[in-house]
Swiss-Prot record:
Protein name: Arginine repressor
Functional description taken from the UniProt entry: Regulates arginine biosynthesis genes.
One term of GO molecular function: DNA-binding transcription factor activity
Biological process, per Gene Ontology: L-arginine biosynthetic process; protein complex oligomerization; regulation of arginine biosynthetic process
Transmembrane region(s): none
UniProt-listed HAMAP family: Arg_repressor
Subcellular location as annotated: Cytoplasm
Amino acid sequence: MINEKADSLVNAFKELLSQESFGSQSEIVSALQQMGFTHVNQSKVSRMLTKFGAVRTRNTRMEMVYCLPNELSVPNTGSPLKNLVLDVDHNETLIVIKTSPGAAQLIARLLDSVGKSEGILGTIAGDDTIFVTPTTGNDIQVLITNIQKLFESSL
């Protein structure tokens, strides 16, 4: 009976975090209590967040929320690139690529490897953002199209 309750609490906890809408531990506590887990408090939620490796990251609405690592789509060598790239935008001189957390350096290295022959002068990568500088005289729209074709392949 106790294990069943613990398992259902863990399942409810993981389900809540997968919604990516909880920005504080107190919000998670309230949601779990509304689901019938009245014995849950902030310290219990804090221990669960640590145990399952939850982190705070930005969701699609740019809000800081808790989520579990498997929701972060941590890249591996079998991940299709299109699953790691969230957005490609540009101005007249620079391309900005938004990726899943942890994927930017992997993708930037790939872009650097195709290099000048494809019109890429260089890249700068953080955790989830890449700045791509095109070579002089290159049509930025053509470069974006080439980059997007590259993302259709896998690593």
